[in-house]
Regions:
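Exposed, low-structure sequence patches enriched in small/polar residues
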Residues: 1-222
Length: 222
């Protein structure tokens, strides 16, 4: 028979986004008077001085506690105190992304994500029934949060795309090309077998270059 059973779920979220409303800078717009094919790209070149930023963080904690009543001891007159059974999980996820259209032809994107675990001592977290254990848990959690938790998984990605301004050059206005670069990095913590034995971590790294080109022969011969 169950004497008492408690389940507690906590979740806290925070998100921040910054999107700049800054007019792009065109350094050559007024310097170059002519607007022929060779100066058109320079006059249209615009620099964005600030990127857009997004940050998200979430903390999730689950605590379950159950206490069983000793019916056998009550019947025989010999009480047998059954220990409390409990389980707990405390996680902290963080994500960051940056998007920067540095020029009207060059776009840069960076994103990263971390899954961390908040370290908790294996004690009954009950302020009334176990005040010493609760204080130990509280101090340990504060320290783990100050250390940003124990990272379990980390991912990051970097992308850059450049639209080559070939169509603005008179002799190449029949072509269109773009160059892109993509790099990813992944890290996973290895499993912990015991206090003294840990499996190795897993790291993955990948890079990729892409070049795409289109040729418009109708524009070439017309």
């Amino acid at each position: 028979e169950t004497e008492y059973e408690t389940t507690k779920d906590y979740r806290a979220n925070f998100a921040y986004s910054y999107v700049p409303y800054v007019k792009p800078i065109k350094p050559f717009d007024k310097l170059l008077k002519k607007n022929n094919g060779y100066t058109r790209y320079a006059k249209q070149l615009a620099f964005n001085v600030a990127p857009s930023i997004n940050f998200q963080t979430a903390m999730m904690r689950n605590y379950y506690e159950i206490k069983l009543r000793d019916l056998t001891g009550a019947a025989t007159g010999v009480p047998n105190d059954i220990p409390v059974t409990f389980s707990q999980n405390f996680y902290w996820d963080r994500a960051f992304s940056l998007n920067w259209a540095f020029t009207n032809n060059l776009n840069i994107t960076f994103s990263s994500g971390t899954n961390a675990r908040i370290e908790e001592p294996y004690v009954q977290v009950n302020k009334e029934l176990n005040p010493d254990g609760y204080q130990l848990w509280k101090d340990s959690v504060k320290k783990s949060i100050a250390d940003l938790g124990t990272p379990m998984k980390y991912d990051q990605q970097f992308m850059a795309t450049w639209q080559l301004p070939l169509q603005l050059i008179p002799v190449l206005d029949w072509t269109n090309a773009s160059l892109s670069y993509n790099a990813t990095y992944n890290w996973d913590r290895g499993a912990t077998v015991s206090e003294d034995i840990e499996m190795g971590n897993t790291i993955k790294n990948q890079r990729q270059f892409d070049l795409q080109a289109n040729l418009n022969l109708l524009s070439l011969y017309n």
